[in-house]
Amino acid sequence: MSRTMMIITVVVVVWAVLFAIFMLLDKKRKDAQNSFSEENRDKALVHLYCKNIKIDNKPLSEADYTIGEYLQKIVALTSGLHTIEGIFESTDTVMGKTRNVKSEKVSFELDLEAGNKYTVGMYFNSAQENKDADKAILEIPLSLYRESDNIEAYIIAYRET
């Protein structure tokens, strides 16, 4: 067997083993997420695409949460008004260049209803521009400088039901 064939065989075997391992890990994560959603169907499920999260002035570690498919935090909260705080980040490609945008710590209140699913994240277009204005329950415009009228991004909360 030639040296090249041996290297190719080793690479294929390693790839196959790693592929199987990651498929199992992904299945385990999906099962955990589905189980979490089922166990908390009587609560509001909030998908948060941010970091350094505090809910009602308590760290995320004190809340009932799991990690979602896109590394978002899925938090189960009771109905009512909740204060959410976090640092939001997003990436955009403008004219072939990648632009990373990161907010300062942003705090806002959301009135949640049990049995609904909510998504909170940073977007570069408003809910109206995305034609999702009917689903948006909160929209916070962000600018590069305080008091500026030049809106760079939005933090939007959508109700998915």
Name these PLM-found stretches:
Residues 1-76, 87-161:
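Short loop/turn and low-complexity linker motifs enriched in small/turn-promoting residues
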